[in-house]
Amino acid sequence: MANSERTFIAIKPDGVQRSLVGEIIKRFEQKGFRLIAMKLIQASEDLLKEHYIDLKDRPFFAGLVKYMQSGPVVAMVWEGLNVVKTGRVMLGETNPADSKPGTIRGDFCIQVGRNIIHGSDSVESAEKEIGLWFQPEELVDYKSCAQNWIYE
């Protein structure tokens, strides 16, 4: 498919503990995106510090890393047309109070510190994040039988 891209989506410990994994996957599948990698992982401090390196000087950095280590994370790679931009719209605003109903955060979150999900904010960030969380052989390339019903 032309112009296809990949994004990294992570369901944070609060989303896993609240049993929202299936609902979140369902939304991405129903939109028409293709899941090409997924794993349940207890993220290490080193992985999280590298993932959030852009936030290292922020006052909440240490708490964020500690929180992300507090439970399992579901790491995923999704593929599709404009999946980075569309995925971010589906997630809603970082602060759930600013998120519209119908978005993941608008429907399931109250506080910014428990916003249940992370999504890459650019194609470049997605490539970096996918490389941090997955080995190349963990990405499964296949043709979905629904692809012709989703894309022209």
Swiss-Prot record:
Give the UniProt record's GO annotations in the biological process aspect: cell differentiation; CTP biosynthetic process; endocytosis; GTP biosynthetic process; nervous system development; UTP biosynthetic process
Q: What class of enzyme is it?
A: transferase
Any one GO cellular component localisation term in the record: nucleus
Keywords annotated in UniProt: ATP-binding, Cytoplasm, Differentiation, Endocytosis, Isopeptide bond, Kinase, Magnesium, Metal-binding, Neurogenesis, Nucleotide metabolism, Nucleotide-binding, Nucleus, Phosphoprotein, Transferase, Ubl conjugation
Under the heading SMART domains, the entry gives: NDK (SM00562)
State where ATP binds: 12, 60, 88, 94, 105, 115
Q: Which residues carry this modification: Phosphoserine?
A: 120, 122, 125
Location relative to the cell: Cytoplasm; Nucleus
What Enzyme Commission number does this protein have?
2.7.4.6
Q: Name one GO molecular function term.
A: metal ion binding
Q: Which Pfam families match?
A: NDK
Q: Which cofactor is recorded for it? A: Mg(2+)
Q: Does the keyword Lipid biosynthesis apply?
A: no
- The UniProt feature for the cross-link Glycyl lysine isopeptide (Lys-Gly) (interchain with G-Cter in ubiquitin) gives its location as 100
Q: Which PROSITE patterns match?
A: NDPK (PS00469), NDPK_LIKE (PS51374)
Keyword Glycosyltransferase assigned to the entry: answer is no
For this protein, the activity regulation entry reads: Autophosphorylation at His-118 increases serine/threonine protein kinase activity of the enzyme. Interaction with the SET complex inhibits exonuclease activity.
**Record's catalysed reaction(s):** a 2'-deoxyribonucleoside 5'-diphosphate + ATP = a 2'-deoxyribonucleoside 5'-triphosphate + ADP; a ribonucleoside 5'-diphosphate + ATP = a ribonucleoside 5'-triphosphate + ADP
Residues annotated as the enzyme's active site: 118
- Database matches in InterPro entries: NDK-like_dom, NDK-like_dom_sf, Nucleoside_diP_kinase, Nucleoside_diP_kinase_AS
* Function of the molecule: Major role in the synthesis of nucleoside triphosphates other than ATP. The ATP gamma phosphate is transferred to the NDP beta phosphate via a ping-pong mechanism, using a phosphorylated active-site intermediate. Possesses nucleoside-diphosphate kinase, serine/threonine-specific protein kinase, geranyl and farnesyl pyrophosphate kinase, histidine protein kinase and 3'-5' exonuclease activities. Involved in cell proliferation, differentiation and development, signal transduction, G protein-coupled receptor endocytosis, and gene expression.
**Subunit composition and interactions:** Hexamer of two different chains: A and B (A6, A5B, A4B2, A3B3, A2B4, AB5, B6). Interacts with PRUNE1. Component of the SET complex, composed of at least ANP32A, APEX1, HMGB2, NME1, SET and TREX1. Within this complex, interacts directly with SET. Also interacts with TREX1, but only following translocation to the nucleus.
Q: Give the UniProt family note.
A: Belongs to the NDK family.
NCBIfam families noted in UniProt: PRK00668.1 (NF001908)
- Its recorded name reads Nucleoside diphosphate kinase A
| Gene name tied to this protein | NME1
